Regions:
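N-terminal Sec-pathway targeting helices
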Residues: 1-18, 22-27
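Glycan-processing catalytic domains of CAZymes
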Residues: 8, 22-378
Length: 378
């Protein structure tokens, strides 16, 4: 009888433990599934204090679900995580998901950042989406030669760019800890993904073609089975800095309708506590959130046509004389590609992806129609 009771208690204990483990597994699987399927919209916060962060969060929390803490002083200069923790707590309590910018995880930069990231998922659960690692890796290569100074060929430049970033201490650290890695950029999206980034935000700013930015970033993410988004950023170097409310609303709609998983409004420290965002921009954001809520079941625009660039051809494509890998001047292929891109963008708009002739991917299976870079296009 005693043996039967003991066996019964053991059986009950096993069932309870099994149920608990299963429940925890299902909870995290459901959380991951939910964030996988969600659309995220929010602000990239570029200021430096808890007070200012709370002001922005209170302003936008009813029509956003994402907050990016994009502040070098908060995540790198501070000697401890107190400020960052308070902002993350406030964002999570406001029912916002959040991403945190870090410049590096080397101990010489700081001694708390590594531990903070390791503990973040436990502290905030699914609200912590990942790390925004540095900024504009492709753009910095073009403007500063940040990754590679010299190379003998386009293929060598590609290999050096990808290997330098992918094997860096910070990228390696995040990958080993299974932390999703984000960045934003305006060139070389495909090579950002190859370097280890899980999500890249295409920068909608200046006079850059939105169709081209979408085609390059969405096309790269599709080839590599990654996520993509758009960040609405600088239009001017002086006030008002950003486009009008009407202009940024149009950019948000373009990104959302084209299938972006993330749409972000860039903000930056300036004279007032709300940075460069004005009431006009907040009204446009609220209007966009209403559009998203009303069109959540609307089928997104999927690319049907692909324009195939030569492999390793890291041309900026912002203007006809743009650099290649930030090292070489435009070559004989550049003018052909420029002309063809203009024709295809006019004809197909957001139905166009711009991808690379990488032999490891079956490109033709993914699109109804493809054009190689030097095709004759009428």
């Amino acid at each position: 009888m005693r043996i039967s009771k003991v066996a019964g208690y053991i059986l009950i204990s096993i069932l309870v433990i099994s149920f608990s483990v299963t429940s925890i597994y299902v909870f995290y699987q459901q959380g991951n599934k939910d964030s996988k399927e969600k659309f995220f919209f929010g602000v990239s916060y570029g200021q430096n204090t808890v007070e200012d962060a709370k002001i922005i969060i209170d302003k936008v929390k009813n029509y956003t679900n994402l907050f990016i803490i994009n502040s070098f002083p908060i995540s790198t200069n501070n000697t401890d995580s107190e400020v960052l923790n308070e902002i993350c707590d406030y964002a999570a309590k406001s029912d916002l998901y959040f991403i945190v910018y870090f410049f590096s995880f080397l101990q010489r930069i700081g001694d708390w950042q590594q531990e903070w990231v390791i503990d973040a998922k436990q502290n905030w659960g699914e609200k912590f989406l990942g790390v925004y690692l540095r900024d504009e890796p492709g753009g910095r290569q073009f403007e500063e030669g940040d990754v590679i100074k010299n190379a003998s060929s386009y293929s060598e430049a590609t290999e050096n760019f990808v290997s330098t970033i992918s094997t860096s201490f910070s990228m390696d650290f995040l990958k080993k800890k299974c932390i999703p890695v984000f960045t934003s950029d305006f060139v070389l999206y495909y090579y950002d993904y190859l370097s280890g980034y899980d999500t890249v935000f295409a920068e909608f700013g200046w006079n850059n073609s939105r169709i081209r930015q979408v085609g390059l970033c969405r096309g790269a993410s599709k080839m590599l089975k990654k996520d993509w988004g758009a960040i609405i950023t600088w239009t001017y170097t002086q006030p008002p800095y950003l486009g009008s409310g009407t202009e940024i609303y149009a950019d948000m709609i373009t990104a959302y309708d084209a299938g972006a998983k993330y749409v972000v409004m860039f903000d930056y420290e300036k004279e007032n506590q709300k940075g460069i965002l004005t009431e006009e921009h907040f009204l446009a954001m609220e209007k966009f959130w209403e559009y998203v809520s009303s069109n959540s079941n609307k089928e997104k625009i999927k690319a049907q046509v692909a324009y195939i660039l030569p492999n390793y051809y890291g041309w900026g494509m912002r203007h006809p004389d743009d650099k290649i890998w930030g090292i070489w001047d435009a070559d004989e292929k550049s003018s052909i590609i420029w002309e063809n891109l203009n024709k295809l963008e006019t004809k197909y708009g957001l139905l166009l992806d711009i991808i690379y002739d990488d032999p490891q991917y079956d490109i033709k299976e993914s699109y109804d129609q493809t054009f190689v870079w030097n095709a004759t296009i009428n």
